[in-house]
Amino acid sequence: MPMSSPIGRLLAATFLFIAVAGSAHADTLRLGINDSPQNAAIELAAQLVKEKGVEVEVLSFSDWNTPNLALANGDIDVNYFQHQPFLENAIEQNGYDLVPVAYGVENKVGLYSKKITRFDQVKDGDTVAVADDPVNQGRGLHLYQRAGLITLRDGTGPKASLADITANPRHLKFIELPGPQLARVLDDVTLAQSYPSHILAAGTTDPGSALLFSRDEESGHLYALRFVVTSKNVDNPAVKAFVDVFQNDPRVRAAIAQAYGNPDLYALAWLPARKEASR
């Protein structure tokens, strides 16, 4: 059938539409995130990467479990909310085929209080808060140990749990909460583990006022957020284009700095340590 016929022209137009639509879908990136001060920078990067022909749909999740489930199910193409230990635990627990492909910002974690200013003011039987997921709970418990409030079993690593506490001389009562909620319980507990990013988002206190911060540099940026994809998507050019803009565009970097307002609350994990002071 000659393509000059009406049906031929219709088929040609249909094939062209499918080709264009398929190309557009290939360059449309569905990015899953959590509530974070970085979100303004993420949205800015999503606008800037349009110059490279990539459309980004940013989807925000309210918990720490759904972003990985959505990624594994193909509902999104990449997520950005978790550090390596959290990802490894999610893979172990759920069998996800997920791979980290790039570093993002590393958030400090701290012990916050609106009731005390020194750890020696903690009273016998006080209630304190930690994250309820295995990895972030361990990170918080190591802070409580550094503060001199508890002792953990020798050799306890990132997955320390309440069961690993071998000494609790002040008989602290630990409550376990989802990470994003920890910033909102400071009126109800003596101490709470929390991320400055969550404190910023909640507006409950000064994010720089933690009595103790983590020493993340010592872990080799183990707790930096990662851009994560499925294994079949590791070479996705749209992901690479977005990450390039997020990491290297000075406007995005300025948006990150403005969001945190304090360079001591975060690190740009993709940069050599010697450059971070000038971030």
How would you label these PLM feature ranges?
Residues 1-12:
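Bacterial N-terminal signal peptides that target proteins for export
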Residues 101-151:
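A conserved helix-loop-strand patch within extracytoplasmic ligand-binding domains
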Residues 36, 60-64, 74, 79-88, ...:
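Beta->alpha turn/N-cap motifs
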Residues 89-101, 114-116, 188, 193, ...:
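Ligand-binding "clamshell"
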Residues 108-119, 223-238:
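A bilobed periplasmic-binding-protein/Venus flytrap-type ligand-binding module shared by bacterial periplasmic
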Residues 138-145, 246-267:
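Periplasmic-binding protein-like
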Residues 59-69, 156-184:
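Short helix-initiation/N-cap motifs at beta->coil->alpha
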Residues 35-57:
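Short, polar/charged alpha-helical segment
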